[in-house]
Amino acid sequence: MKKYIVLLLSFFLFSLQLVSQSIDKIVNKNIYISYYSSKLKVPLYVEYDLFRGGGSVSRKNMRFIEEETTAKNKDYAKSGFDRGHLVSAEDFAFDKQLETLTFSYYNVFPQHPKLNRGSWKAWEAKIREESHRYPLKIFVGGIYSTKKIKNKIGVPDYCWKVVINKKTGKLMHVLLFKNDETQAAFRTTLDDLQKKINYKINFKR
């Protein structure tokens, strides 16, 4: 009986996850496309191209833009989570207008501060450096279950990145990050990632 209850609970939680992880809005922000869940008020993933990213534009006076159906600034206040960029602001720091586009809640999910400022940031810098050698197609997203902050905003259990060399089509990185204080990062496969996110992404474009 106990085993049956555990299985039933597991199925219920998995069903909740499937319901949550559904894209109901696709938003084109010029430099990236956000595949957004209005239920979770976060992007499930974004995709963008990057070539020779980086620059010296200051982000000092840039503010996050609140838009229809998105999270608000107050939702993150005292939440214990950073407003983590999926598309790194520094990737487009060669142009102020383009960098400003990354400060949208269509490009933000809650990230543990140690991850956002640690291994996540380090990998952003590494990938940006690689963009000076090859044009890249980049996908960035989260894997969600039931964790929330204020206003029922979904918190990813894991964050992920997929990086493809656009010129050759070669898969360069499939990375999974634990969204906690361990900031653990490890490589995985596209097949394994696809099973975890429960919705289809066409990575080969």
Residue ranges: model-predicted function:
Residues 4-14:
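Sec-dependent N-terminal signal peptides
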Residues 15-22:
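Boundary at the C-terminal end of the N-terminal hydrophobic targeting segment
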Residues 66-205:
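Domain-level detector of nuclease and nuclease-like folds
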